[in-house]
């Protein structure tokens, strides 16, 4: 198995290096004058037409990397990283700088960012060199400086297209590409944002330059021209208008204040892609096709998963007015700590989906999955109101879980978890995973220090969620956990506690259409996902070959100047979408049929379960004095916790005191200021053994 893994990895590296080499060379005069004529002779066949070269050089390698990555990740389900690889990962994951607006930048991020910027600068330089010194396009008989001005606008649009070749990789939730470099879709959203800013800037400059150029030569109406055999300018204008709307509403100042406008506007991306492809044509579309193709496979599979209703078992309303929802799941569904689950409640919004942190462990809780929801914003407020009312069921759809492909919580000698407010939720799943690993006596567990900050005393109810209710003393006896809790806005413990602050649990009636959350194509079924990617892409190649050879070629004869320019791009989009729809649907339905027996067994179990009425349980030990003292989970929490009032944690002191240990893992989740403070401490010269990792809820 190790040899197979090495072989697959080598093939992926070779394909990727070749793909990058093409991107480096494609802007050069050597590629344009020497390579292109030879490549076109063999690759621009009657079956693929003018798009053949880009299809073979820039689409095929990345699609096969995606297929091979499915095989690689399937082999690596239980990873055993060599010590050399692990040391390299630590070095490349070290924080290099902490600064706004980039945030926390690691060595890996800085390296790849500099290389990507170098690629953009290299490409722009070579494109301009071609225009200014080799062949200056001047069909309008404009002045030389005007023609050069136009060339600059055209070439910077080409640079924006390079950004689009990577734009959708970070937001493909069940991506098989991101795990290869240790990333998840949630942690990669910032790269999507950076690429979006750069590409929109390039396209805006491209548009403005052409508007000025056309105004200078008295052809401003070219903005609305739609040439049937050449680039349709109107399509580009429409795409730019949509792009500006998406860009403006995605800016942090706008997005955080008016999230729903941002959310709905961002769903115009489909329309943006359509007009963009019509504008640039099929050949240029093939340059960016892999990330769009993989994104839409992921998007359609997510849609298929979301059509099922998930079985909501119970809801706990915490004294802090936050919620814990528990769903039923099949034992075969596995996920890693710090994973997230997307929720959709049709009675609140027909189209909105929101991500929430999973607090359970799939190795500890085989049949249930829990998420914690902070009451913040209109959607969560409506959900809280629904659950607080006298309902006995709630229709919920889920999507996910999504998280790291691997997460070895016991890889460090000691572990420091720093959280602020609801940032504690990812660490609940980490601690529960450690409890699961503690059942294996041969596993060495790290010492765990949880440093958590809350605004108010009642927020300590989050600590009630750390241990499952059915834990015994033997289950947690090997876990060395210490909790330092800080209450920043209160100087002492409140003398009285209102009744409404008690922890309440509500149980829901099972409904006939409810199903447990089950594995879908992706992290739990990499090979089946590989089948979808391979079959849909091969089908696309076959269909585009048939259409080109027997429908387009008899009209155009590979001249590129007779058959409608826009139709070529539309054919690519239509056939690609059809292949994704057919292949994904067939494989998904096949997998659904295989899981049908498990669903039947689940429904039989559900029908035999007696419905429990809503209860106001004794509540948190912080608030409900009626809590039974012999309750093992809460007794353990009390013994492990020290509460500090009216102060914030001295993170520098805490972290540097622990730095003397041989290997200390530091994870932080909370406000930006807290994350940046911890990152600066871990990256300072005083801390050599602190290995930093951040989790963020906002972007």
Swiss-Prot record:
Induction and repression of expression: Induced by copper deficiency in a SPL7-dependent manner.
Q: Which GO terms describe its biological process?
A: monoatomic ion transport
Q: Which residues lie on this side of the membrane: Cytoplasmic?
A: 1-9, 74-101, 215-264, 333-525, 591-699
Q: Which GO terms describe its molecular function?
A: ferric-chelate reductase (NADH) activity; ferric-chelate reductase activity; metal ion binding
Question: InterPro entries given for it?
Answer: Cyt_b245_heavy_chain (IPR000778), FAD-bd_8 (IPR013112), FAD-bd_FR_type (IPR017927), Fe3_Rdtase_TM_dom (IPR013130), Fe_red_NAD-bd_6 (IPR013121), FNR_nucleotide-bd (IPR039261), RBOH/FRE (IPR050369), Riboflavin_synthase-like_b-brl (IPR017938)
Its top-level enzyme class, in one word, is oxidoreductase
Q: Which residues bind heme?
A: 192, 206, 266, 279
| Gene Ontology terms: cellular component | membrane
The protein's topology relative to the membrane is:
Multi-pass membrane protein
FAD-binding FR-type domain segment(s): 305-408
Cite the binding residues for NAD(+): 400-403
* UniProt keyword annotations, A-Z: Electron transport, FAD, Flavoprotein, Heme, Ion transport, Iron, Membrane, Metal-binding, NAD, Oxidoreductase, Transmembrane, Transmembrane helix, Transport
User: Subcellular localization, per the record?
Assistant: Membrane
Ferric oxidoreductase domain sequence ranges: 157-275
> Which stretches face the Lumenal side?
30-54, 126-190, 290-311, 549-568
Query: Membrane-spanning regions, if any?
Result: 10-29, 55-73, 102-125, 191-214, 265-289, 312-332, 526-548, 569-590
Q: What does this protein do?
A: Ferric chelate reductase. May participate in the transport of electrons to a Fe(3+) ion via FAD and heme intermediates. May function as root surface cupric chelate reductase and participate in the reduction of Cu(2+), for Cu(+) acquisition via Cu(+) transporters in response to copper deficiency.
Q: Family assignment?
A: Belongs to the ferric reductase (FRE) family.
State the name under which the record lists this protein: Ferric reduction oxidase 4
Organism listed in the record: Arabidopsis thaliana
